[in-house]
Amino acid sequence: DLCAYFDCPLLLGRVQGLLEDGEDLVQAKEWIKDCVRQVARHAGETGVPIAYEPINRFEMNYNHTTKEMVAYIQEINAPLSHKVGLLMDVYHMAMEDNSIAAAFVRSIPYIVHVHFRDSNNGVPGSGTIDFADAVKVLDAMEYKGWIALEVAFDFCDYEKGARDSMAYLAPMIAAAQQCR
């Protein structure tokens, strides 16, 4: 209901849980599917988009790649009229997907929300992730949703982080738009 009030998507990340050794993955995935379906039904009544985030293998123990998460989302969505989509986080994609650009292209119909965070948990341009391909693909697909800058709390002050991020990303955005 808060998402409807603020006109923003509901973001699901770690909601899938971290399984302990010996826990039944198949059963856990069924429970999570049931929970997400219940949330999706309510979100459908309020018009709230849902974005489910694949998380890297160091933080979660299943649904790491965008390909795995798309398959899981397809299972979740099968009986639903209000569909669940993807939250694409380049930080996790850089660890789990062979190509960030290919993962974006493969997932276009499902993308609801995007996170830009560099490999060191800092602002784009402070680590090793090349954001240029992501910017090009998002521009080519005419993505109109939010791109959130996700930065670790202790990395920098937020105003400086926002300025540094835009200084780094603005030339890529301009170059991508010139290629249209």
Regions found by a protein language model. Give the residues of each.
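Active-site acidic/histidine proton-transfer and metal-coordination neighborhood
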Residues: 1-85, 95, 179-180
